[in-house]
């Protein structure tokens, strides 16, 4: 089957990009590719043949139909207007036409200088490229909307960050790379007609059912808000901290995008700050819901020329509804509840308070709870708590709540084990793979990718364990 590409963004939004080619790396080589995703997309195996060099994966060649562009956008960074940003090192190579008529962006990250590189060098480093590939695939297999990773190319090109590293490229796939920042760019340039063109593009290609509806713009923004609410709810339930929720890192389609200083909770700490550059804690774990709303408010402002204020406010209310509804549903599933009762939030908050006091591991606590039998408080989970009396008191209330459900233990445990992962991408696991890869050993990178494809499968090895002491002290930043 021949791959087919289109250039809808280039053809329909001429003011939003600069056309240019990728700049290849020195001695580029393919070190990993997503075989499962490649099969789903009918990508010929010959394209991954190392004897052909880095090929399209390293920006050395283009496939027929590709028309590469770097997109321009702006945004608020850490709550402050940052002005023009754009693809400073990424290039949208083209949009693959799929059998169902939809498209998939092929976006090459680390592809070299663009007009939007500002003071940057247009490169990505191997470390950050590996982290993004692992994180996006981990999120996908957890069932959370996300961009995908198709390939990684390493090289001998030196790249200076805090230390000297080597350049790499990531082929990132997504239904769209349209960001809140695209709309902000033209709003602050006082070009409302281009803001409306972006909205028209989004509706035409992603919500075509609304094209001929009078209230299409209001309906569209409501859906953007709802998708954002559901996405943030998913993040909170698995303990995912994005780390840098600038408006230019927010997807119109409600995808997790731009994995930088992310982290999954180890010890339960609602104030967890994954990004060591976030000195004020703006993007701490428990602030993500309010930051997402703030970002939606910035997007809403750009839409005021063609959506009434009341409609925008209704959409923002929809965000809150979607967030709270989806979060409540997910957390009840994590606790094994099939119905909703008025004291559920109190019971959950009591558990969170106990976990915070004890420094309980977020992922392992819920996974172990999913194996607990309601007839007995004696369990491996109980043994992880120092204050056994406090745990026993909570578990008695939890067990009483379970008895109100007409569901046997086996069915409850099955449900809980489908939503409480045994494995998440802990930073130390990613770092171990990075350390090996930087020495030329890709085995752990491949192995970790395979492990992350089965997050709900119990393991008795270190992939499912608490981090070692050195793994708790890892610092990550926006440097990539």
Swiss-Prot record:
InterPro entries attached to this UniProt entry: adnlytase_SelO, SelO
Residue sites binding ATP per the record: 86, 88-89, 109, 121-122, 172, 179, 258
Gene: ydiU
Cofactor(s) annotated in UniProt: Mg(2+); Mn(2+)
Name of the featured protein: Protein nucleotidyltransferase YdiU
Entry EC no(s): 2.7.7.-, 2.7.7.108
Family: Belongs to the SELO family.
Catalytic activity reported: L-seryl-[protein] + ATP = 3-O-(5'-adenylyl)-L-seryl-[protein] + diphosphate; L-threonyl-[protein] + ATP = 3-O-(5'-adenylyl)-L-threonyl-[protein] + diphosphate; L-tyrosyl-[protein] + ATP = O-(5'-adenylyl)-L-tyrosyl-[protein] + diphosphate; L-histidyl-[protein] + UTP = N(tele)-(5'-uridylyl)-L-histidyl-[protein] + diphosphate
Keyword Metal-binding included in the entry's annotation: yes
Short name of one Pfam family: SelO
Lineage: Bacteria, Pseudomonadati, Pseudomonadota, Gammaproteobacteria, Enterobacterales
Active site: 248
HAMAP family found in the cross-reference section: YdiU_SelO
UniProt GO MF annotations: AMPylase activity; ATP binding; magnesium ion binding
Keywords per UniProt: ATP-binding, Magnesium, Manganese, Metal-binding, Nucleotide-binding, Nucleotidyltransferase, Transferase
Entry keyword annotation includes Cell wall biogenesis/degradation: no
Binding-site residues, Mg(2+): 249, 258
Known function: Nucleotidyltransferase involved in the post-translational modification of proteins. It can catalyze the addition of adenosine monophosphate (AMP) or uridine monophosphate (UMP) to a protein, resulting in modifications known as AMPylation and UMPylation.
